[in-house]
């Protein structure tokens, strides 16, 4: 096994919840005063090895973005330790690392400086960045006038050209159009072949299964499951559709066993409410909604659905 480039051990992170700005001021003046606290992350353990691609999944509010912000050093944990090796570069919140008053070209050098690159190094990479971003003359306009899609084009183009050892992406690619997303995923695969370690947060199950070597399921600030991406995504989807006691039992089962395939739900032990309809096959049936697209060289064949 290759050497670890990232180790998260016993990490906790919480945030105070204030009823009013006055309470926030009072707490700032009296740090020991009692306030309500939201526990965003609890006892996180995660080791990432060189060249791995890790997918992190979980519902909104599970703690995914908080974990990535801790890993990149944007925030510090309440307790625990995070060890990093090499250059860690992240694409987190849209527009982070950019000055809205600067032009796109100025922000390339500004963002590069934040990431530890010299002006000469960024000069050498400028043409590659402009070519990948493909935003034309807008590169010399202030980024405050950019659309979200243009912003992510420029941000992604910068970070992939800063020689990262660890690349962290937090759902930002979902903003781009389909063509740009395909270009980004092709570039990520190229970085994988070069041994770059990638942490990817995405709600796109297909992307996690296709790109990642391992997946992590975060829920309510806890790591419930780590393992093969297809199995982790499957259990994540099961968890999404559970509520109340059933959800609590499944979470406990995942924590204790590290797998969800042996779990027996309440519904599986009861009689089905709806009986399956008999199958009908007719070769003469022709769908009226079929849409044919111009071929671009890719052919899909033997399309079928596999059960988990």
UniProtKB/Swiss-Prot annotation:
SUPFAM superfamilies in the cross-refs: P-loop containing nucleoside triphosphate hydrolases
An MF annotation (GO) of this entry: ATP hydrolysis activity
Protein name per the record: ABC transporter protein AbcA
Binding site for ATP: 58-65
Originating species: Aeromonas salmonicida
InterPro entries xref list: AAA+_ATPase, ABC_transporter-like_ATP-bd, ABC_transporter-like_CS, ABC_transpr_TagH-like, Bact_Polysacc_Export_ATP-bd, P-loop_NTPase
Key words of the record: ATP-binding, Nucleotide-binding, Transport
GO cellular component, one term: membrane
